[in-house]
């Protein structure tokens, strides 16, 4: 990256840094220094005079007040060439700042430093009817971003001590970057994510944009403006051209990998769990490889990535012919590689739409959402897979897609390939394709991975065996998986032999000084998995297989499968925010917080790895959830990110986890318009995993079709005359706590046992089925009435009193309460099986 562009991006990232530095003192001592002056002094004192100018002059009124002699002074403090064009660079950042978020001017008139970051979820409305309940205005506590379980609070104000704590830590680490000559945009971005994700960008009443997202989007827009005007940047004053918001200066690049469902789930049941995780992880790094290649070729930074994960990505870029040509090349090269490796099972749809500066106000062009525009283009490409290659080399597509003799079938993915490799598992030899062979080895090592290196070269990684785990080829690079990064001696050895490249650090925002010559990228992954005993002597513990997991269930030895995602996600982004609030910074905040929940919070809830106040808050949030065991740990997160997840485990633990996660999501968003739906299914351990995933997906669709904000636990019986198969989360928990919870207790071994005769359980289930078959008749009611009368001496008063409520028909309510017991009692019936 050339220096002028790098200064522009760094200037944009740091232009509002004074907001972190002056608010603590303003709260504690009432001292009112402007954020511009605070940022200017901080950067100047670190001998960064050019960057200090961006902190001081990023508002239009200040720039228009500058005189020609001021710009001559800039040339003296700037590097050769950069100081000469600083006027244009300052105007670029000023314009980017305005386009990123238009709320800036209000803070100058209404400075309230103790105001916290309001949850952006509080601004989402209009997704469901207003009857769902009021939207709470809550705020996130000021804290570092990382592996923490954060819930918004009511009536919260930021203290001066909290600001000074963040300020002190940020200053210390930023100074280290300067001292180590590591002041690269991506490292600064990583530092800002850690310390400013929960700092409000403004301190006005509705300050729901984080400082991090505002700085990140300002840098993204600034880089686009610089590259769009690059040919003129040294020719004179470009103020009017920079401020022209009608010109189509920007591109929204969208990427979507199709064939994901087939790639992940179409595998044999043998060793399926290990393959599922490694395949979903493989797709994560495939997306990262493509995204990194795009931003490298376009001379952008990770600031320009709006979202990447789950097989999708969006990037903001300058609208130039070179950029559009590079997008076409990346699409062709990636698809040629995917065709060769996967025979057409995976395909990259990659395209872009142009927009102007005014579109950033509400992320629309001509009244249509930019998301809709780009997704339409991607949909067109997916209907014409490999059209670019077919037009030039049709025989290549035909041959790779299987129209060729002498191919063998991979024992795992069942794909016809030219060559298979033998992999030994105990006494068994399995014939697998090249990709499955790499994923085979990766599956066992996933829990150990601390990071990976993306490089164009292979390097000499095996010279550091204590760090090397695996190497996998991607379309544009090699990914080398490494461990031991917490040990300085291993990091030093790695630096001696590693080629140039990018280092992805898993679930951490730490920047190790040994990595100063690398681009360092945080990658948050929900990868919790219950451990099992290694199959061979001397092996470390590995992920349990499905047979072992099933045996750890409460009651029936079965496997549970859970599919879950956010309801109406497209509506939330396109219509959930009021038109005047659909700024790119707010959209970025919304997207990042959802991804945080599915990457970080899911991992913490699944593992229970929280302590102190976080543990107390989690216990409070999940207090009313169905509970079959105190320690729920036998689950494996196969995939979680963006807005959805797929979890496998002991059926009882997965069942419990589903409700706990829904409760956490509800406590995280505090908005009845933002909900989750889920499909849950139970199977024998030998049942093909891809079929169980399909059934869970069907149940998820059932939950959505019946109104959303629901969980579907069982297929609706054909004999049922009640067309409702899914349960609202709160309704299920109410029924569980009101009726089911009084029917069982847990013994010393953690197993569930009935506190009533099992015949009682079956009788209620029978009545529920009878009602479902003939809801207009009351035979079931009469039957229960006489049954309760006969059983008064055999059933405790507490239980009988609860269940006698079923005898009170609610004329205007359908279905009746007896029907709501059907699925909860089926769950209990499984829990007491031996």
Model-inferred region functions:
Residues 338-348, 374-389, 668-672, 694-720, ...:
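Catalytic/regulatory signature loops of cyclic-dinucleotide turnover enzymes
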Residues 58, 251, 301-316, 343-362, ...:
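A short glycine-enriched loop-to-beta-strand structural element that forms part of the catalytic core
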């Amino acid at each position: 990256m050339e220096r002028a562009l790098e200064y522009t991006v760094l200037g944009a990232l740091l232009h509002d840094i004074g907001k972190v530095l002056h608010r603590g003192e303003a709260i504690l001592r009432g001292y009112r220094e402007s954020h511009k002056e605070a940022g200017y002094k901080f950067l100047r004192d670190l001998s960064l005079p050019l960057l200090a100018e961006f902190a001081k002059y990023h508002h239009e009124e200040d720039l228009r007040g500058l005189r020609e002699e001021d710009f001559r002074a800039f040339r003296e403090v700037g590097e050769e060439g950069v100081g000469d064009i600083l006027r244009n660079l300052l105007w670029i950042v000023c314009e980017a700042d305005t386009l990123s978020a238009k709320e800036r001017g209000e803070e100058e008139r209404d400075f309230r430093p103790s105001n916290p970051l309001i949850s952006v979820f509080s601004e989402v409305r209009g997704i469901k009817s207003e009857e769902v309940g009021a939207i709470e205005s809550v705020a996130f506590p000021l804290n570092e971003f990382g592996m923490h379980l954060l819930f918004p609070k009511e009536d919260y104000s930021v203290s001066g001590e909290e600001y000074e704590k963040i300020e002190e830590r940020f200053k210390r680490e930023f100074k280290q970057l300067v001292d180590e000559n590591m002041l690269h945009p991506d490292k600064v971005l990583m530092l800002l994510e850690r310390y400013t994700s929960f700092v409000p960008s403004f301190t006005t009443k509705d300050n729901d944009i984080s400082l991090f997202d505002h700085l990140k989007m300002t840098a993204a827009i600034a880089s686009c403006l610089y590259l769009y005007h690059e040919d003129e940047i040294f020719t004179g004053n470009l103020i009017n051209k920079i401020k022209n918001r009608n010109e189509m200066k920007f591109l929204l690049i969208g990427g979507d990998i199709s064939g994901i469902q087939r790639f992940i789930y179409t595998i044999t049941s043998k060793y399926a769990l290990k393959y599922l995780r490694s395949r979903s992880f493989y797709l994560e790094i495939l997306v990262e490889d493509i995204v990194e290649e795009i931003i490298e070729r376009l001379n952008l930074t990770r600031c320009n990535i709006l979202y990447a994960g789950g097989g999708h990505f969006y990037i903001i870029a300058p609208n130039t012919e070179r950029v559009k040509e590079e997008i076409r090349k990346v699409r062709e090269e990636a698809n040629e590689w995917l065709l060769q490796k996967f025979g057409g099972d995976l395909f990259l749809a990659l395209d872009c739409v142009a927009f102007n500066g005014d579109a950033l106000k509400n992320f629309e062009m001509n009244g249509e959402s930019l998301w809709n525009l780009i997704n339409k283009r991607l949909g067109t490409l997916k209907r014409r897979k490999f059209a670019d290659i077919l037009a030039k080399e049709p025989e290549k597509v035909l041959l790779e897609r299987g129209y060729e003799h002498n191919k063998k079938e991979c024992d795992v993915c069942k794909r016809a390939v030219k060559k298979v490799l033998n992999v030994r598992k105990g006494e068994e030899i399995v014939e697998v394709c090249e990709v499955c062979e790499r994923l085979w080895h990766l599956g066992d090592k996933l829990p150990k991975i601390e990071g990976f290196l993306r490089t164009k070269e292979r390097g000499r990684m095996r010279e550091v065996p204590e760090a090397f785990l695996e190497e996998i080829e991607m379309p544009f690079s090699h990914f080398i998986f490494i461990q031991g990064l917490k040990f300085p001696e291993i990091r030093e050895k790695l630096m001696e032999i590693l080629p140039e490249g990018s280092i992805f650090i898993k679930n951490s925002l730490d920047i190790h000084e040994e990595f100063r010559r690398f681009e360092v990228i945080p990658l948050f992954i929900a990868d919790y998995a219950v451990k099992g005993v290694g199959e061979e002597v001397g092996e470390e513990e590995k992920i349990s297989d499905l047979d072992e997991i099933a045996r750890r269930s409460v009651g029936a030895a079965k496997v549970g499968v859970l599919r879950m995602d956010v309801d109406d996600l497209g509506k939330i982004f396109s219509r959930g925010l009021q038109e005047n609030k659909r700024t790119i910074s707010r959209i970025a905040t919304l997207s990042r917080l959802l991804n945080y929940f599915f990457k970080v919070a899911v991992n913490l809830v699944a593992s229970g790895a929280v302590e102190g106040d976080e543990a107390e808050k989690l216990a409070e949030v999940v207090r009313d959830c169905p509970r079959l065991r105190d320690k729920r740990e036998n689950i494996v997160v196969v995939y979680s990110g963006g807005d959805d997840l797929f979890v496998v485990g002991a059926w009882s633990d997965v069942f419990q986890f589903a409700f706990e996660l829904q409760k956490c999501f509800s406590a995280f968003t505090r908005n009845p318009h933002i909900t989750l739906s889920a499909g849950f299914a139970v199977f024998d351990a030998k049942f093909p995993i891809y079929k169980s995933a399909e059934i869970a997906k069907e149940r998820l669709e059932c939950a959505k079709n019946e109104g959303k904000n629901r969980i579907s636990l069982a297929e609706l019986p054909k004999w049922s005359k009640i067309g409702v198969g899914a349960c609202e989360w709160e309704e299920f928990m109410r029924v569980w706590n009101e009726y089911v919870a009084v029917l069982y207790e847990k013994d010393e071994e953690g197993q569930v046992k009935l506190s009533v005769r099992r015949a009682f359980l079956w009788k209620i289930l029978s009545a529920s089925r009878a009602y479902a078959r003939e809801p207009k008749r009351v035979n079931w009611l009469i039957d229960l009435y006489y049954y309760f009368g006969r059983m008064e001496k055999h059933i405790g008063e507490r239980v009988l009193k609860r269940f006698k409520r079923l005898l009170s028909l609610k004329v205007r309510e359908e279905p009746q309460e007896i029907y709501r017991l059907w699925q909860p009692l089926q769950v209990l019936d499984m829990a007491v099986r031996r």
